[in-house]
């Protein structure tokens, strides 16, 4: 649990300059071999720590967020690990946060059924969703997930609340110009419930990979590659940011 700048989620176009109480737990529903948070996601250490983790109730989290309002806190962000593996807890806590007039943020990999998203929709104000790549092979065989599920989640989330996306560029996996062009074109084509295009305004964060966890067989992504892919994405998107550079 930490009081973080909102930009750290990362959210660049949602209450910039504010702070948000950020909380996480243990576990994830993907198996990314390069996981940046493997200590709390799906490593052996994560499962060992989880057995002795502190338990916090929705009421306690809501009270903590309210107490921090005098430190520019605008609400509560579920982050660090994958929050949707415990979506009922997120729902119950977010309901209390909203009742207190505060904001709720979800940082997620988007690997969830749309029924879960609809259950959370009344209580979520912003999301940063990982769009980790744009090929089914990468999602299925490297990450252990489903690109189609994530695309459906993003498309609906963009109709519900403020959405920003993050893509970690891994050398030799999702770093081609063609893939970034296809991804950004798909994002730009997203529509609201009335059929109007909204995708061009969705911010995309393109981040640099560093070797860690089970993927140490390749170097960090070159900074110039990140900047070049950002320029490609800007062909279709208005707000493109680079990270870890």
Predicted regions and their residues:
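Structural preference for beta-strand elements that scaffold enzyme active sites
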Residues: 73-77, 103-105, 126-128, 162-164, ...
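Alpha-helical scaffolding segments of alpha/beta enzyme cores, especially the outer helices
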Residues: 60-63, 88-99, 115, 119-122, ...
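Conserved Radical SAM active-site core
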Residues: 1-126
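Glycine/serine-rich loop-strand microenvironments at binding/catalytic pocket rims
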Residues: 30-31, 150-167, 174
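Short glycine-enriched, charge-decorated loop/helix-capping segments at active-site entrances
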Residues: 47-51, 140-145, 218-219
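Conserved glycine-rich "GG(E/T)P / GGGxP" loop and the immediately following alpha-helix
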Residues: 66-93, 138-151, 167-182, 188
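Conserved radical SAM core fold
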Residues: 41-44, 83-85, 110-117, 126-143, ...
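Auxiliary Fe-S-binding modules of radical SAM enzymes
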Residues: 177-245
């Amino acid at each position: 649990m930490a009081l973080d700048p909102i930009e750290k989620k990362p959210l660049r176009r949602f209450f910039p300059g504010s702070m948000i109480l950020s909380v996480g737990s243990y576990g994830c529903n993907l198996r990314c071999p390069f996981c940046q948070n493997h200590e709390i996601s799906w490593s052996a250490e994560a499962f060992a720590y989880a057995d002795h983790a502190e338990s916090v109730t929705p009421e306690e989290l809501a009270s903590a967020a309210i107490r921090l309002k005098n430190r520019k806190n605008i609400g509560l962000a579920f982050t660090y690990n994958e929050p949707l593996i415990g979506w009922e807890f997120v729902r119950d806590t977010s309901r209390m946060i909203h009742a207190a007039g505060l904001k709720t943020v979800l940082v997620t990999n988007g690997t969830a059924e749309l029924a879960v998203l609809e259950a959370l929709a009344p209580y979520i104000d912003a999301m940063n969703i990982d769009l980790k790549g744009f090929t089914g092979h990468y999602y299925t065989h490297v990450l252990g997930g489903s690109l189609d599920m994530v695309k459906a989640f993003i498309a609906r989330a963009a109709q519900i609340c403020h959405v920003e996306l993050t893509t970690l560029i891994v050398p030799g996996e999702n770093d081609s110009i063609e893939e970034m062009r296809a991804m950004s074109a798909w994002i730009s084509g997203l529509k609201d419930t009335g059929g109007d295009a909204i995708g061009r305004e969705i911010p995309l964060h393109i981040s640099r990979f560093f070797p860690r966890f089970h993927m140490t067989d390749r170097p960090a992504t070159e900074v110039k590659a990140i900047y070049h892919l950002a320029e490609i994405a800007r062909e279709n998107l208005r707000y493109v940011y680079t990270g870890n550079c």
